[in-house]
Amino acid sequence: MALIEREMPVNRVAEILGVNPQRVWTVFNHWIEKARQSDDVSTITRLGVDETSSKKGHKYVTLGVDLDASRVIHVCEGKGKATLKNIKEHLEKKGVPEDQVTQLSMDLSASFIAGATTYFPDAEITFDRFHVVKLLNEAMDKVRKDERKEHDELKGHKYTFLKNRQNLSDKKEKSLAEMIQLYPTLGEAYRLKVLFNDLWEMPDKPAACAFLTEWCNEVEAAKISAFMTFAKTVKAHWSGIVHFVESHITNGILEGINSKVQLAKRRARGYRNIHNFINMIYFLCGKMKFDYPLYFT
């Protein structure tokens, strides 16, 4: 365990110890399961849910994260509605009733939404703003690509339109100013993109709803197809988007956790089943207490 803590892949640990990797996994899994049994999740009220793949193009696992403690409390196979049931059942086994979870943060996945409303009916959903902005940026880039078909000079300027303006170099800033003047549709799309992000600074829900209503009206007037599609998505997920201005929760914490999940993939290289991978996630992201020999705090 001490060697694995030093960011060493399990296969390398087995090589150093002169044992079969499966023996290392057996010992590793024993201590993870023991720590899981005593893991205290009694204070959780705000839950984040996100999925990641165990390998590129392979099986998915869903992470349940305590957003206040910034740690993974449960991992299960799959990425659909049933994963929310799995998380709920884990919490209930730990003595946490479903109504203790008052806030849920997730992407706009229909299966996650179905799971949340079924298994955590008392929780208010906040759709992760970073996922919403990702969809907005995809709409912006779709407009650029459509314009690029007739204007080659727009090639290579994806991030000129996606980055925050203050983060552009002087050269890119000049190019942006020129392009939004030369191409009115692109300029209007960029204006709408920048304007949308004012939503996150609204003081309360009524203000957010009024702002978003006006923004959707402007999109309708602009008649830019990609933005009309995005606005349709916004309307379909309205309450969970505007709820951000009250909850201020995101899955941003999961970005840091996901970097550790990538590390888990490297350390678990050669794992024979998804159970080993899941336990490596607990080890790196669960902030659990272990009492194995030579464990240092």
Give residue ranges: language-model regions:
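Short, surface-exposed amphipathic charged segments that create phosphate/polyanion-binding patches used
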Residues: 62, 137-148
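Short, positively charged, Gly/Tyr-enriched micro-motifs
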Residues: 1-58, 99, 111, 241-242
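Acidic-residue sensor for enzyme active/binding pockets
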Residues: 51, 147, 255
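Acidic/histidine-rich catalytic cores and adjacent linkers
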Residues: 56-58, 66-70, 77, 85, ...
